[in-house]
Amino acid sequence: MNKALGMIEMISIPKGIEAGDAMMKAAAVELVSSQAVCAGKYIVVVVGEVSAVEASLKAGKAVAEMKLVDSLMIPNIDDQVPCAINACNEIGKVGALGAMETFSLCTAVLAADTAVKAAEIRLIEVRLGRGLGGKSFITMTGDVAAVEAAISAGSKLEEVQGLMSDSVVIPAPHPEIVKALV
């Protein structure tokens, strides 16, 4: 079964907790993340069947009201993305290292999904605004050409929306840098 991913971002932590509760009660979805992020925002990320995620998002948005900053629905999310949000993907040997930084939390998730669908890479992490002053970043690994293609695909998507901060491909990262990231 192909899963959908839904995400909402709010500027109120109490309202975010309430919206997350409403999202979970509205439909049979799986909670990926429900947490406070920088700077004083709150995110809720769920996965499930498309109709369930749509119902869940609708309920969350209704509760969030004017506190809603952004929302996202990806109907056919790659399985690596939800795990990367929680930094729990099995990485194995790290080849080339790629990183993208965004100004938007929702667009980081979209960029990660685009990158992993564009090339044969493994997502290491999709860090959503925790300790980053409201930014997000995506790390990935694979062979050099694949990481370059993934970064290019994700970056082009971000540039259209004007929310890409920076990106890099490191063909042979130092083992201590790899250890710090995985």
Residue ranges and their predicted role:
Residues 2-39, 55-80, 85-87, 95-135, ...:
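Long, contiguous binding/interaction regions
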Residues 91:
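Acidic, glycine-enriched active-site microenvironments
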